[in-house]
Amino acid sequence: MWAWALLPICLTVWATGGIWIVYAMSVSNGSVNLSDGFPYISVSGTYPPQSCVFGQVLNVGAMLAVWISVIRFQQIRDYNCHSVLNSVSLATGILCALGTSIVGNFQQSNQLQTHLAGAFLAFIIGNVYFWMQTALTYMVKPKHGGCYIGPIRFCLSIACTALIVAMAVFLKMNMKSVSAICEWIVAMILFLLYGLFAVDFWHLDGHFFHVKKRRTVIPNEMEVSTVTLSI
């Protein structure tokens, strides 16, 4: 059903719009002073009232991300691709969503170490997730999106990786504003990568979740009679 394509689009629109609204709130109420430099995403969402909105935006986004990851996992299985990579990809997708929720609920001003752990899961593991999805895009058949979706995912994943490295380097050089800009771009790329699943989900007609019982091995009559005689 084509309506499934709306799910990743909703995540992209919700998350992108949500964090920019949080940024606007933090600037308008003076929680963030732009004369001190461009803020990190988490700095914008540290103080109330925008911290409440920030947490809600990321919690809903995390829920949608888990939903998308599970559907994508099953879709790939339905294409008879039973690669271990698909299972590992599901696990990393769920970890990415968990990290996103942690970032929203543990502000850096209150629980810095927990917040940083969540950021690692959201950004680093999230990037790994989309590298795996890029590989799976080339492995499965049919290939939705023609010959374009694979290269697009590949280029966006490269850009995401490069910007994460740049973010760490600029932070080490104490160029926090530039590092923060890199973080914002990484977040936008990750949201866009989630949105690209709309191309795959458009073709979800005929895909079903199956719950199968384990087959019970029943001995044949010869085996039963042999056992009986031996007794």
Swiss-Prot record:
Family: Belongs to the DRAM/TMEM150 family.
Keywords for the protein's UniProt record, in alphabetical order: Autophagy, Cell membrane, Cytoplasmic vesicle, Endosome, Glycoprotein, Membrane, Transmembrane, Transmembrane helix
Full protein name: Modulator of macroautophagy TMEM150B-B
Annotated InterPro entries: DRAM/TMEM150_Autophagy_Mod, Frag1/DRAM/Sfk1
GO biological process, one term: autophagy
Source organism per UniProt: Xenopus laevis (African clawed frog)
Cellular component terms per the entry's GO annotation: autophagosome membrane; endosome membrane; plasma membrane
Family annotation (Pfam families): Frag1
